[in-house]
UniProtKB/Swiss-Prot annotation:
Its main location: cytoplasm. It is found in: Cytoplasm. This is CRISPR system Cmr subunit Cmr3. The gene is cmr3. The lineage of its organism: Archaea, Methanobacteriati, Methanobacteriota, Thermococci, Thermococcales. It comes from Pyrococcus furiosus (strain ATCC 43587 / DSM 3638 / JCM 8422 / Vc1). Part of the type III-B Cmr ribonucleoprotein (RNP) complex, an elongated RNP with Cmr2 and Cmr3 as the base, with Cmr4 and Cmr5 forming a helical core along the mature crRNA (39 or 45 nt in length), while the complex is capped by Cmr6 and Cmr1. The 5' end of the crRNA is bound to Cmr2 and Cmr3, while Cmr6 and a Cmr1 subunit (Cmr1-1 or Cmr1-2) cap the 3' end of the crRNA. Changing E160Q: Still cleaves target RNA when assembled in the Cmr complex. GO terms for cellular component: cytoplasm.
Length: 322
C-alpha cells in the first residue's frame, strides 16, 4: 500500500450533485471530495502515460485499488465524527447500543453535530476506550465564500444579472491509500510535483510514501461485539452490507444496528461516454455498524464493503464495543 498526500495550493471546490446555474441558483456549494475524485485524477494521469489497462478505459473501476481517502490539518489525518458520538452541554459523549426485546437500540441522548476528530481520538474510539470528546477537540472544516460572475460561452463577456456565491473549502491535506497491482503508480506520481483535482481543476502538490498508516495495522483481538466505522461513503443497502460482512469474515451475525444519517448522493462525469453518471446513494462517512456475532470473531483493522470498492468507497475500520 502507498500513501499519496495532496496539498491544495488554494481553496477547493467539489460541487454537490444537484444542478447549478448562475442566476437561478445563487449559491454553488462544495462538498468534501468523494473518493472517485482522487481516483479520477490518478486515472487521468495514467491514461496520459498510455497505461490504458491500469486506467480501466470504458470500465467503471480501474485496475488499481484506491483503498480510501481522508482529509487532514496541521494535526494530521482527520475523520468524520462517528454518528454515535452525541453533543451534550460541554462534551461529545459516546452512546453505545442497548437492548430492547432482543434488538439493539440506540438510546435517544442529545443530538448529533457533524465535525471531525484526529486519528488518535478515532483509534481510541475503535478500541472501545473513548467515553467522551471535549468540544474543542472536534474539528470544523473552514468554508470561504466568494462572488462569481457568469460569462457567456459564445461572447466570453459578463452576462447581466448572473452573479452567484461560491462556497469553497479550506482543506490543508488530502490523503489517499492505493494498492498497486503493478502499474508503477508510485514512480509515476513521484515524478510530478502537482496534479489537478476535480472538474474545477484545482491544483494540489503531491507527495508519495510507501509506509502503510498505523490505523491499517491495528490488532483488536477476538470478540462477539464488533463495530465497523465507515470512513468513506459505502454504496449498498445495509442488509446487503451485513450479508457481505458475514461472507467475508465467515461468521454469522446474530444482530446488528446501523447508526447513520440520510444517504449521500454520488454522481459525476463519465469521461469515456462524455455524459453525467447516474446517481447512486451511499451510507455516509461517519456511520457505524454495530454487530453481535454468534461466536467470537477476529476483528480486522479494516475491510472494504459495498460496491465500487476500487474507487475508494466502502472503507470500514474495525473496532469493538461494550
Amino acid at each position: 500500500m502507498i500513501e499519496v498526500t495532496f496539498t491544495p495550493y488554494d481553496v477547493l471546490l467539489f460541487r454537490e450533485s444537484r444542478p447549478f446555474d448562475a442566476g437561478s441558483e445563487s449559491v454553488a456549494r462544495s462538498i468534501i471530495p468523494l473518493p472517485q475524485t482522487v481516483a479520477g485524477a490518478i486515472r487521468t494521469l495514467l491514461f496520459y502515460k498510455g497505461l490504458k489497462n491500469c486506467v480501466g478505459v470504458g470500465e467503471e473501476e480501474p485496475e488499481f485499488t484506491l483503498v480510501g481517502i481522508a482529509i487532514g490539518t496541521e494535526k494530521g489525518r482527520i475523520y468524520p465524527l462517528p454518528f454515535n458520538i452525541i453533543k451534550s452541554e460541554k462534551f461529545y459523549k459516546v452512546v453505545n447500543p442497548g437492548r430492547f426485546l432482543g434488538k439493539l437500540i440506540l438510546p435517544p441522548k442529545g443530538k448529533y453535530k457533524s465535525g471531525y476528530v484526529t486519528e488518535s481520538i478515532l483509534e481510541k474510539y475503535l478500541k472501545g476506550e473513548l467515553k467522551e470528546v471535549e468540544e474543542n477537540k472536534v474539528i470544523r472544516i473552514e468554508k470561504e465564500k466568494r462572488i462569481g460572475i457568469k460569462l457567456s460561452r459564445e461572447k466570453k463577456v459578463v452576462e447581466e444579472g448572473m452573479l452567484y456565491t461560491v462556497e469553497f473549502l479550506r482543506i490543508e491535506k488530502i490523503y489517499a491509500w492505493i494498492e498497486d497491482p503493478g502499474c508503477g503508480i508510485k514512480d509515476i506520481l513521484s515524478s510530478y510535483e502537482f496534479l489537478t483535482l476535480g472538474g474545477e481543476s484545482r491544483v494540489a502538490f503531491v507527495e508519495v510514501d510507501d509506509k502503510t498508516p498505523d490505523i491499517f495495522n491495528r490488532e483488536l483481538g477476538s470478540t462477539k461485539k464488533a463495530l465497523f466505522y465507515f470512513s468513506t461513503p459505502t454504496i449498498g443497502k445495509v442488509g446487503e452490507i451485513v450479508q457481505e460482512l458475514e461472507k467475508r469474515l465467515n461468521a454469522k451475525i446474530d444482530d446488528y444496528l446501523l447508526v447513520s444519517s440520510r444517504p449521500t448522493a454520488i454522481s459525476g462525469w463519465d469521461m469515456h461516454e462524455k455524459k453525467p453518471k447516474g446517481t447512486k446513494f451511499a451510507i455516509p462517512p461517519g456511520s457505524v455498524l454495530f454487530v453481535e456475532f454468534k461466536e467470537e470473531v477476529e476483528v480486522p483493522p479494516y475491510i472494504k464493503l459495498g460496491k465500487l470498492k476500487k474507487l475508494g468507497y466502502g472503507l470500514a475500520l474495525g473496532g469493538i464495543w461494550e
